[in-house]
């Protein structure tokens, strides 16, 4: 038994505390998340559902050591205690696409008090293609569109999609050690990226993927039917060839794909703005002052990307909001005769 009252928090305890506050007080719902970085995202999700009757408090289960297996720790903490007044908010990882083939996947999908991102992680939504131009503007204060992020990520996704299906296939079959997420990530890296060489980067990527797909086909000669069936099923779950990037490992997408591309784009946009200042300055003092002012006004890429909230129209995000709406507004049961 926990030594502190806070060690034994449950949905029922929060419900009792809510009732003690009186009928007119707003109902408090605790939302447990996995890490500090997740608090801002889930606050943006849940704040739209707050009203005169309820509010959310997003927090970590801080009494536990979250440095190892934090996701499993979170699930163990809340699986027995969650309810209408205490919910768990987690990254989907592969658990959504595994569709109950593991105990954790079953918990994530079927527990009505566990909410997940549908996309692999929050980072995937922060990298939502239609929002990335706005990120470059926030970083550089230059609204010149010099790179088509949506087309690039569409081509990237279409290139990696066949191999992604193989990745899920191995996890569904329980043989993921033969082709791990790390193995997949090594294949789908784009290497040293340049704006001028973007097309060549995609072509090299396709070649690497095709080679690995052929290898996996040889290693699994009887998998064709189950592979094609899984491919169709994944489409019904939202994984289309053009949106695959939303479902790969979030840290890999963020750190190794999107940030390097954003750096190339933002560097060029900054130079473009600085060249404009140099051309238009009337005298050297004005030039120095304008360059200094502009330099102090620009922002770092990673913090801006982590605070990007331009994913509100992304399909996974819309599905997440629908889940929360249903939780807060359960359908009324028709009386039985």
Regions found by a protein language model. Give the residues of each.
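Acidic, divalent-metal-binding catalytic cores of TOPRIM
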Residues: 1-337
